[in-house]
Amino acid sequence: MSSILPIIDAGLPTGIVEPFAARVGRDAETLTRDSLSELQINLGKLCNQTCTHCHVDAGPTKTAENMSPETATRICELVDACESLTTIDLTGGAPELNPSFRSLVTHFRGNGLRVIDRCNLTILSEPGQEDLSDFL
């Protein structure tokens, strides 16, 4: 016994499959933001690793994409103006390799914010990072 399944043209209403937009329009709830409590900040693509699974394509040669000190200063100003923030999530590459990393952490913690460092842990064995775990 063989049967042939119908070919459904997604652009035409068939009654078999409800179009996505119609379903969302019928069942969706309105989403609203209460307040911004967590902000993730990417400090650049510079990293001590070259992982094939890296979603930002970070690596040791990615210096051009590093956040500038001027941008870091502006980020601090914007964060200071947002009273609802409780957490700053620093990521990269290896955020610790950005020259502004420690001053950013110091600034945010000095303002009572929780700081998350998305660390690959191998950075702890890099020259100049020996005290990183104590700093954090």
PLM regions with names:
Residues 2-119, 124-130, 134:
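Conserved alpha-helical substructure of the radical SAM core
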